[in-house]
Amino acid sequence: MKLDKQMIIAHRGASGLVEHENTIEAFEKAVEVGADSIECDVRKTKDGKIIVVHDEDYQGKLIKDLSYQDLSILTTANGFLMPTLEEAILWCKDKIVIDIELKEEGYEEEVIALVKKHLSCKDFLIRSFNDSSLKKIKRIDKNIKTVLLLGVEYPKWGLFTRLSELFPLLRVLKTKCDMVSPHYRLVRFGYVKRLKLWRKPVLVWTVNDSKLMEKMLIDKKVAGIITNFPDVAIRVLKENKKSIA
């Protein structure tokens, strides 16, 4: 993935433009509107399938306690399918960069094996809130591009965690991550400038308001944003280029 321009990353596909996020339909819409990359989440089912899904449960049942067949029956009844990670990879191949978020620890090797079976390292990223997952990925293959996610909803260590997100140098060094992806509320106190000094591109999540997109992309000049509305973000960039011209 070359960061030779600001990246518009479709959050769970173009999730704001379709009925069901993290589906092939959402991925198709992301490509249709011109997104540079697709972010998706993965979890593991009871029978060992790695699937594309954000929440830890579906209709009150934990993903880890359901087989993929069980899940497929439930989701089909609601008019969609949760793709496997391999299906998502194959769909994205030769179309768009896939940005995979590990929602849990413990199956990093399986994810890497699946991705590298079909893609070269330039065609995917792996992101996580878990420092240990990122460290493990780099031990397996230092050429894989990793993204340190920052801005957990419920910080495990309270204020200490928040400070480590606002001033993440130690975590950046420990994980050897290639990029940093903070929640937009963390982007303050010269955040982007500090990360640029450490040569770490900043990919901000989840930016859905056009004014906030403009602030991040134009004013703060971040390397990219993750958004449910990639079409709006692309328009913001184009309108800025026109005004400069």
Predicted regions and their residues:
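Phosphate-group recognition and catalysis centered on beta-loop-alpha active-site segments
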Residues: 1-245
